[in-house]
Swiss-Prot record:
<dbReference type="InterPro" id="IPR027410">
    <property type="entry name" value="TCP-1-like_intermed_sf"/>
</dbReference>
<feature type="binding site">
    <location>
        <begin position="87"/>
        <end position="91"/>
    </location>
    <ligand>
        <name>ATP</name>
    </ligand>
</feature>
<feature type="binding site">
    <location>
        <position position="415"/>
    </location>
    <ligand>
        <name>ATP</name>
    </ligand>
</feature>
<dbReference type="GO" id="GO:0005737">
    <property type="term" value="C:cytoplasm"/>
</dbReference>
<keyword id="KW-0413">Isomerase</keyword>
<dbReference type="InterPro" id="IPR027413">
    <property type="entry name" value="GROEL-like_equatorial_sf"/>
</dbReference>
<dbReference type="InterPro" id="IPR018370">
    <property type="entry name" value="Chaperonin_Cpn60_CS"/>
</dbReference>
<dbReference type="Pfam" id="PF00118">
    <property type="entry name" value="Cpn60_TCP1"/>
</dbReference>
<feature type="binding site">
    <location>
        <begin position="30"/>
        <end position="33"/>
    </location>
    <ligand>
        <name>ATP</name>
    </ligand>
</feature>
<feature type="binding site">
    <location>
        <position position="51"/>
    </location>
    <ligand>
        <name>ATP</name>
    </ligand>
</feature>
<comment type="function">
    <text>Together with its co-chaperonin GroES, plays an essential role in assisting protein folding. The GroEL-GroES system forms a nano-cage that allows encapsulation of the non-native substrate proteins and provides a physical environment optimized to promote and accelerate protein folding.</text>
</comment>
<keyword id="KW-0963">Cytoplasm</keyword>
<dbReference type="GO" id="GO:0140662">
    <property type="term" value="F:ATP-dependent protein folding chaperone"/>
</dbReference>
<feature type="binding site">
    <location>
        <begin position="479"/>
        <end position="481"/>
    </location>
    <ligand>
        <name>ATP</name>
    </ligand>
</feature>
<dbReference type="InterPro" id="IPR027409">
    <property type="entry name" value="GroEL-like_apical_dom_sf"/>
</dbReference>
<dbReference type="GO" id="GO:0005524">
    <property type="term" value="F:ATP binding"/>
</dbReference>
<dbReference type="GO" id="GO:0051082">
    <property type="term" value="F:unfolded protein binding"/>
</dbReference>
Amino acid sequence: MAAKEVKFGDSARKKMLVGVNVLADAVKATLGPKGRNVVLEKSFGAPTITKDGVSVAKEIELKDRFENMGAQLVKDVASKANDEAGDGTTTATVLAQAIVNEGLKAVAAGMNPMDLKRGIDKATIAIVAELKQLAKPCTDSKAIAQVGTISANSDESIGQIIAEAMERVGKEGVITVEEGSGFENELSVVEGMQFDRGYLSPYFINKPDTMVAELDNPLLLLVDKKISNIRELLPVLEGVAKAGRPLLIVAEDVEGEALATLVVNNMRGIVKVAAVKAPGFGDRRKAMLQDIAILTGGTVISEEVGLSLETATLEHLGNAKRVVLNKENTTIIDGAGAQADIEARVAQIRKQIEDTTSDYDKEKLQERLAKLAGGVAVIKVGAGTEVEMKEKKARVEDALHATRAAVEEGVVPGGGVALVRALQAISELKGDNEDQNVGIALLRRAVEAPLRQIVANAGGEPSVVVDKVKQGSGNYGFNAASDTYGDMIEMGILDPAKVTRSALQAAASIGGLMVTTEAMVAEVVEDKPAPAMPDMGGMGGMGGMM
């Protein structure tokens, strides 16, 4: 095991503070409408230019191991805020830096670190409760566009396209961000339920010009097994032929004789039919088949529930207005399932999302939720160069997270004003002793840091602006983009309450832990001498090269 170096007390805290400040100073340069860019070196290819706080934080590793520990802890603040709300990483970093700097000053002055932390925690709880009181619901498209615009560093086109996407697919719909091929941002929406399985045979195509199979007012047979014997299907096919409606078969697989017979029947026009594999694998396949059944008002034919193909009737089949199949995807439009059943299924999936700890499972469950509840929108980001494309895509993703957070917990006045207004919650707050009161006062100063930094980045005088904002009330604040004062909400400067809340909670959590640090342990880096050149042994046979 490698030897370790241990630092204690002030010498440990000083080293940690250096790391905190290096990382935070790089990140906070990006805050606000007049925030600057940061250029990140890449091991190959062009450097990346970004105004995204978490991207800057992730790149920073310091040579000194003790300083690096401080930097990594602040990086954790940014990641925590990003994981919970998807945005607010720069605000969280600025808050953490302010808490740590103020806190370590108090520790150096002889305050008890544990009581300081208790004071910080008390004040944080009070401010979070006040932020919830200040939050206004965010329901209309205009407010959603404004939140998106602010989060995308004042790019109105991004705010607008996100608001349009949310309007089209609903608040629960899935919105994905992809790299486009043009200069402009584009939005495409898939309505209905789409899953990534295409037709099993090109002979099902009935629209050769677009290479799709389209079924109008079809019945849907959902089967949880492979179908290879046509005899099993005959009772259902006869019933469907009598009803004179097309049929879509969704099964684990349709193969051999069964598939051949379906193709022949389809080509002869006896039964208009198409077959597709069920989406997903294993348990997820069963769950997705059940989703389709609920959406279309059908029943999954499964031996687990005592149903077999031979006994299936038309009552077991689902209904939809239209189904479109291409080579890769199947889209079911306007399923005939009961609204109450769909809502119950949505609530069930939502509960599973809350309970799961795996990010992959969460993503898949959210996709299922969107397919049932709304639809899927794809934002294709357009840009002039590859470097700009990457930077813009990161901003669109940030803005998307921010708008989702705004819909979830409402909006508060932006530009650091909400935190200043929430200070009233701790104006009378008292701790159990004087050291806790210092912790509360410390947070009172720290929550002004985001507003001060926004003003500093815009070239203003932070103290003057903070005083003027404090003299106002309600939504009154400073618009750094136009250097004017006024009602932040009327000026369209909004922050999601969830983003502000999670930024403060993450900063107070890590800040409190750093203030109470007493020792740091790191590996000793030994300078290994460079290996000597091997003896070439005279290199016989090379005498004539002089």
